[in-house]
């Protein structure tokens, strides 16, 4: 689960996650996808580049 807002600046970023993930999975360059989506701030870009999906790992321990 991607955070709804950037931790640093507060910009809403979660609405871009599905498009970003789909395009990167299809083989596009992550930097080019972020540029195309209009994610230009370094703080917001790091939210996408450093995100790791842990929900599937943690869900068995509920």
UniProtKB/Swiss-Prot annotation:
Any one Gene Ontology BP term: DNA-templated transcription
Cofactor: Zn(2+)
Major localization listed first in the record, in broad terms: cytoplasm
InterPro entries per the UniProt record, alphabetical: RNA_pol_su_RPB10 (IPR023580), RNA_pol_suN_Zn-BS (IPR020789), RPABC5/Rpb10 (IPR000268)
GO molecular function: DNA binding; DNA-directed RNA polymerase activity; zinc ion binding
EC number of this enzyme: 2.7.7.6
GO CC, any one term: cytoplasm
Stored Pfam families: RNA_pol_N
Cofactor, free-text remark: Binds 1 zinc ion.
Cellular compartments annotated: Cytoplasm
Assembly and oligomerization: Part of the RNA polymerase complex.
Family of this protein: Belongs to the archaeal Rpo10/eukaryotic RPB10 RNA polymerase subunit family.
UniProt protein name: DNA-directed RNA polymerase subunit Rpo10
Organism: Methanosarcina mazei (strain ATCC BAA-159 / DSM 3647 / Goe1 / Go1 / JCM 11833 / OCM 88) (Methanosarcina frisia)
